[in-house]
From Swiss-Prot:
Its EC number is 2.1.3.15. Keywords: ATP-binding, Cytoplasm, Fatty acid biosynthesis, Fatty acid metabolism, Lipid biosynthesis, Lipid metabolism, Nucleotide-binding, Transferase. This is Acetyl-coenzyme A carboxylase carboxyl transferase subunit beta. GO terms for biological process: fatty acid biosynthetic process; malonyl-CoA biosynthetic process. The keyword Ribosomal protein does not apply. It comes from Methylorubrum populi (strain ATCC BAA-705 / NCIMB 13946 / BJ001) (Methylobacterium populi). Pfam families: Carboxyl_trans.
Amino acid sequence: MVEPMNWISEVVRPRIKTLFKRETPENLWIKCPDTGQMVFHKEVEQNHWVIPGSEHHLKMSAAARLKMMFDEGTWIDVPLPEVPADPLKFRDEKRYADRLKEARAKTGMPDAFKIGFGRVGGLPMTIAAQEFGFMAGSLGMAGGEAFVRGAETALEKRTPYVLFAASGGARMQEGILSLMQMPRTTVAVRRLRAARLPYIVVLTNPTTGGVTASYAMLGDVHLAEPGALICFAGPRVIEQTIREKLPDGFQRAEYLREHGMVDQVVHRHQLKETITRLCGLLMDVRQTPAGKPSTPVAPEPVPDAA
């Protein structure tokens, strides 16, 4: 015998719940990877994407990095060169052209680099930031052109060049054209060195692969954010190759600092002050009594290196 339907519990109540269901944004809360603590998204964003309490440094967009660094959060975007899209007509599980389209829609950026010119602590500065959200910040032709354009801007305006590195390495979908960017960016760094302009690298989580093997490890000073993974091949690949367990914290910023590969591990909140001080010293900027930098003593121009 089939029992009569209970209209109150089976029909009316679900409809009432649906009618008055509160819309809750999916990203309202962020879970700390270290402690499991749940923190309001807005609170983390206002704290420059550092979890209050645990001080865990989350990934940060390129635009947010520039806003954090430049005085009053304002800067001039450096126009980046256009490059041929999908020159190899590459396809794996999906077409490379489709991957680019998805990444651009997701990030609102043409590729994985954003470069700005402005003032940091009163000093003119050129800053390049990699966007990990764009195909893991991988280095392709567009990225190589962007890095070189940033270096050229620093040379033209006689400013320090600061890089925030965040990348999974070379972009495999561009093959040899991607690998060619490693020597090209190295030449750009040599031009900065020949002109006696500081090149400071901030290694963020993660910085790996061909980016680590080229411009990310050619700085005059290497800073790193706490806990950042910095390597060529990741620890899992190395363990599978040598069949041995690696030390705790291997290839993390603190481990590399202890072994001389990183000059200093700097909390994100202290990066602007630290970089301003370093650039002031390297550019021979003298502080006025009010604490503001006076006009830097610029080095004499040096012809571009071949």
